[in-house]
């Protein structure tokens, strides 16, 4: 490490291809690493999707057991020790929602001057009850007592974790989930090649979905949709990219419903921008979300997106690509909406890029905003 280089420690559950992880990596790739370097503290000591890239970019990876694997006091002590042993750090940036207050406390005890708590979700579970709300208030007090800066991917996520009053006081930095807009720009000429490389059908309606296999992503609803389309005789293929604890269960359910010839399980996909070119429409029926990076990526790719109204309307970039539907709507309404959207015209490439950049979804532009949060000044941040 050179003497002028600043190091920032990001804390996440694991560096797989989730929304928060992808957002951080998009910023990391654009950062001038001769001046600012990222390191990562995670709760997983098994290999994750982004590990090799992090190491190749000069970052380091550290591990501590999660708060659920230990207890709050032990967790804070472990995080503090990891910070002190591997620092100094100019900032610690925590992305683990309600746990961020414990991380900010550990960073304060370790003497880190800038401690950032970042909200990426509008809830952390389904069936949010009064006990959960009381717990959230306790976590919020811990965050506000120890963080020097608050960030959120959108207003709803900021309001959920930090409270309405802090949003009104403009204490929360809104940092949209920026991406590489040029990388995701539509390229229809490459679609056939990308389909062939992944075993995706060349002559069917391709319905795409990219997410980890967790309850909140509602993969069971996608299988219900697939069964309905099959009953109607629609020639389609549902392409599911991602991995996670429910993957085996969902695949078995697809087998039991005789859907394996119509549903393709791709596993973890490294080149999402290429995969997007193979889709005719993107579907996301999540039970709740913050502001998903993948929906920004889908719109940047020119894809019509049919999403649940549990996802914030602020994800709609105004390109005419997003349709929000209630999960209580008949499955036939979803199917008809998908068919219409897939057949509709698409906005032009330059219009997409300009619109998303104006909304703050250009990762290159967001680098400067993030450095301001860290109180780090650099002349230029154009290293790729």
Swiss-Prot record:
CDD domains: GT4_CapH-like. This is Putative glycosyltransferase EpsF. May be involved in the production of the exopolysaccharide (EPS) component of the extracellular matrix during biofilm formation. EPS is responsible for the adhesion of chains of cells into bundles. Required for biofilm maintenance. Belongs to the glycosyltransferase group 1 family. Glycosyltransferase 4 subfamily. GO terms for molecular function: glycosyltransferase activity. SUPFAM superfamilies: UDP-Glycosyltransferase/glycogen phosphorylase. It comes from Bacillus subtilis (strain 168). GO terms for biological process: polysaccharide biosynthetic process. Its EC number is 2.4.-.-.
């Amino acid at each position: 490490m050179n003497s002028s280089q600043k190091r920032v420690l990001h804390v996440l559950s694991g560096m797989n291809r989730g929304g928060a992880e992808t957002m951080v990596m998009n910023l990391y790739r654009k950062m001038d690493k001769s001046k600012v370097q990222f390191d990562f503290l995670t709760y997983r000591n098994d290999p994750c999707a982004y590990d090799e890239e992090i190491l190749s970019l000069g970052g380091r990876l550290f591990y501590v057991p999660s708060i659920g694997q230990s207890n709050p006091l032990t967790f804070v002590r472990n995080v503090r020790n990891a910070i002190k042993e591997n620092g100094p750090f100019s900032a610690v940036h925590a992305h683990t929602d309600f746990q961020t207050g414990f991380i900010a406390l550990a960073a304060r005890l370790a003497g880190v001057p800038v401690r950032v708590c970042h909200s990426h979700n509008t809830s952390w579970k389904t069936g949010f009850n009064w006990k959960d709300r009381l717990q959230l208030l306790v976590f919020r007090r811990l965050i506000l007592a120890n963080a020097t800066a608050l960030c959120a991917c959108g207003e709803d996520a900021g309001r959920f974790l930090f409270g309405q009053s802090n949003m009104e006081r403009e204490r929360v930095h809104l940092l949209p989930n920026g991406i590489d807009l040029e990388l995701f720009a539509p390229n229809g000429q490459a679609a056939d090649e990308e389909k062939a490389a992944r075993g995706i059908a060349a002559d069917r309606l391709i319905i795409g979905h990219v997410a980890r296999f967790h309850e909140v992503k509602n993969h069971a609803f996608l299988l219900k949709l697939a069964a309905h389309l099959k009953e109607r005789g629609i020639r389609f293929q549902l392409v599911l990219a991602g991995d996670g604890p429910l993957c085996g269960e969902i695949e078995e359910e697809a087998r039991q419903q005789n859907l394996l010839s119509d549903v393709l399980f791709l596993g973890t996909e490294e080149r999402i921008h290429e995969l997007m070119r193979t889709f005719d429409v993107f579907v996301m029926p999540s039970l709740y979300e913050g502001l998903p990076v993948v929906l920004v990526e889908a719109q940047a790719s020119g894809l019509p997106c049919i999403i649940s109204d549990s996802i914030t309307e602020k994800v709609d970039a105004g390109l005419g690509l997003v349709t929000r539907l209630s999960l209580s709507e008949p499955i036939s309404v979803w199917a008809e909406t998908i068919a219409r959207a897939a057949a509709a015209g698409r906005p032009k490439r330059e219009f997409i890029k300009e619109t998303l950049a104006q909304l703050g979804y250009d990762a290159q532009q967001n680098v400067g905003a993030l450095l301001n949060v860290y109180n780090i000044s650099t002349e230029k941040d154009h290293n790729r």
